[in-house]
């Protein structure tokens, strides 16, 4: 196994555009060596929420996740989006395995405890199961993580995909030279979204 690894996170600008997603996955599948893909949910979860009569609620760009919203984001992120990405990667010869953080106890989180806002079922990453991930990588499998984690007490949690990517990358840094890439619509890492 190579001593370097790419961890790449894609956001809504890629996920919501089939042409961009296909082009990205073609390039991603050609990357040599071990790699991990992390994805968010784009606009699809908000779209599905509205279709079933739920109004998405955001606070500073973060989704407030009540029980009904958690059901939707789990279905969309871990189901529809994740499995479509995995199927496309398989068609390109990339042996991808789609997962949430609950699968293989890959990523554990704690429910966000904010002093002013109740984010509901939103998680902050607490632990990454590096052994499990390295086992997948050693078998030639490319993990594809969605933005759902768990608390190891039976509760799924909606978790920021950017954070998942950075925590997975950091957890692997003792075993690999990690290169972390974020593919998003902003011009770079900004101190404020108004700086764009």
Map each language-model feature to its residues.
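Nucleotide/pyrophosphate-binding catalytic subdomain
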Residues: 1-196
């Amino acid at each position: 196994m190579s001593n370097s690894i790419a961890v790449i996170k894609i956001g809504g600008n890629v996920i919501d555009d089939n042409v961009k997603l296909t082009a990205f996955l073609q390039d991603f599948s050609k990357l040599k060596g071990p790699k991990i893909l992390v994805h968010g949910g784009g606009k699809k979860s908000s779209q599905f929420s509205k279709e079933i009569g739920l109004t998405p609620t955001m606070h500073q760009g973060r989704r407030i996740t009540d029980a009904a919203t958690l059901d939707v984001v789990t279905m969309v992120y871990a189901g529809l989006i994740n499995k479509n990405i995995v199927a496309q990667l398989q068609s390109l010869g990339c042996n991808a395995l789609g997962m949430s953080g609950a699968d293989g106890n890959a990523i554990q989180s704690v429910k966000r405890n904010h002093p002013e806002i109740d984010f509901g079922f939103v998680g902050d990453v607490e632990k990454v199961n590096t052994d499990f991930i390295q086992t997948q990588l050693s078998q030639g499998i490319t993990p594809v993580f969605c933005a759902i984690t768990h608390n190891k007490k039976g509760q799924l949690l909606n978790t920021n995909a950017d954070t998942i990517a950075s925590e997975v990358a950091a957890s692997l840094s003792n075993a690999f030279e990690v290169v972390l890439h974020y593919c998003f619509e902003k011009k770079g890492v900004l101190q404020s979204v108004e700086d764009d």
